[in-house]
Each structure stands twice: as structure tokens, then as C-alpha cells.
Curated annotation (Swiss-Prot):
Gene from which this protein is expressed: NTC20
GO cellular component, as recorded: Prp19 complex; U2-type catalytic step 1 spliceosome
GO biological process, one term: mRNA splicing, via spliceosome
Subunit composition and interactions: Belongs to the NTC complex (or PRP19-associated complex), composed of at least CEF1, CLF1, ISY1, NTC20, SNT309, SYF1, SYF2, and PRP19.
Name assigned to this protein: Pre-mRNA-splicing factor NTC20
Note: Present with 1430 molecules/cell in log phase SD medium.
């Protein structure tokens, strides 16, 4: 059974070999590196390649779209603004959603309140009718 030291030395050697290959590819030039990857994109805009890759894999996630948008704006020289909602806008959205829910529940709450009030009044009436007259007991 190999020791931990032997395994770590072997791993380090493999990593060094991979680093050497990467450095060698970087030195051999752009064309050879493109051939190694299997793409010839030296004259294509980057976002076209990203679009083709995204369409071929049916990727419609926000990361791909954001990357495409950033690249287009970099190439056109326009600054890229990330469309994020700030904290205030999120709070406003929550308040609007809460208001919408309250508006939908308002008629139901009114009916429930009326029924509850009627039940309370009915219970009070029953207790009043069941209790003996206190006014007559005090006079005697």
C-alpha cells in the first residue's frame, strides 16, 4: 500500500505535467491552441460563439444571457449595467404583492367578520335571557 507521501508526490508530478502542457500550448500560438480546442474563432466575435453554444444546448439561463449582453456591450464600447433590483425596489414589490392579497381577501374577511359578530351577539342574547333579573333581586 503506497504511503501518503508517495501519493502526494505522484499527484504533484501529474499537476506539474499538466501545468507544463498548458504553458506549452500558451507558447505555441493562438492557432495551435484553437486547433487543440477544436474551434477556429479567431475572427468571430465571442458572443456569436456563446450564442451558438447556448442554442445548441438549449441553455436559456440568466448566466448565458448576461454573458452575451456583457460581451456585446464591451465590443460596442457601451458600459454594461447589471439589471438588479435594489433593496428598496424589492420592498416596494413586496408591499404591492401584500396589497393585492389584502384586496383579494377583503370581501371574504368582511363576510367572516359579519358572521363572527352575529355569533357573538347571539351568545350574548342567550346569556342575557338565561340570567335572572338582577334588578329585581337588589330591590328586596
Amino acid at each position: 500500500m503506497p504511503s501518503l507521501r508517495d501519493l502526494s508526490l505522484e499527484r504533484d508530478q501529474e499537476l506539474n505535467q499538466l501545468r507544463a502542457r498548458i504553458n506549452q500550448l500558451g507558447k505555441t500560438g493562438k492557432e495551435e491552441a484553437n486547433d487543440f480546442v477544436g474551434l477556429n474563432i479567431s475572427n468571430e466575435p465571442v458572443y456569436d460563439t456563446v450564442i451558438q453554444t447556448g442554442q445548441s444546448s438549449n441553455a436559456t439561463n440568466s448566466f448565458v444571457q448576461e454573458t452575451i449582453q456583457k460581451t456585446k456591450q464591451k465590443e460596442s464600447g457601451q458600459p454594461y449595467i447589471i439589471p438588479q433590483k435594489n433593496e428598496h425596489q424589492r420592498y416596494i414589490d413586496k408591499v404591492c404583492e401584500t396589497s393585492d392579497l389584502k384586496a383579494k381577501l377583503a370581501p371574504i374577511m368582511e363576510v367572516l367578520e359579519k358572521k363572527t359578530n352575529e355569533k357573538i351577539k347571539g351568545i350574548i342574547r342567550k346569556r342575557v335571557l338565561q340570567e335572572p333579573d338582577r334588578d329585581n333581586d337588589d330591590s328586596g
